[in-house]
Amino acid sequence: MYALFLLFGLGCDEGKIYPDETVDSGRTATVSLSFTGLKAWPKENMLSLCAFGEDKSKPLQTQRISKPAEDGKRLKLRLNNVTPDTRSIEVAVISRGLRLVYSYYTSPVDDSDEPLDLSVGELDLASFKRIQAQVFDLNCLSCHGGGSGLAGQLDIRDDVAYKSLVNVKAPLSEEGKNYVTPGNINNSFLLDILENNPVHKDMFNSSGKQEVLALIQGWILGGALDN
């Protein structure tokens, strides 16, 4: 009996032969940064820390960023388990369908296994480049620079949009407003067009319109820089 006990006892004592599947795999990306222009914080879309592969239109991983309490507050963000097919780490505006809207910052990723530690500095959310990408390029060029001509004599293609808007009189403004007057949202006809013009006011859903107007207002109040 004692021999049988030893036989079965040894047969059942396999020890711990399975790997611990709770251990993280992949690299970690740590990013330190701060934001200004918080008025332009996305409402419809999401500001996120992202990992992108070869396809730049859709991220492999995202970590949504929480809005800080004030401009300039230093944040430290982390993206865990960065996969080997990652080609860049980016701070970007992402749609709810997880499509890239606009990237504020990008850093290439090499093939090593070392952790990524990135110091980004300060990002201005109310940037003209984001307005160009998110608003003009996606919604306006068919009438203001595309094949059908220039509605309202306004050309907002990427290479001429800034010069077409800032401190330029809007021919359709009855009050004689500029399209954009730096620092003055009440004398910027671009906002009137998006808020009140029958052709344009329904271009976005409610939260999307709030996001676009806040973005443009924040940019104008910040001096309407070519940034």
Question: PLM ranges: what are they?
Answer:
Residues C12-K73, V82-N227:
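Aromatic- and Gly/Pro-enriched helix-to-coil junctions and flexible linker segments
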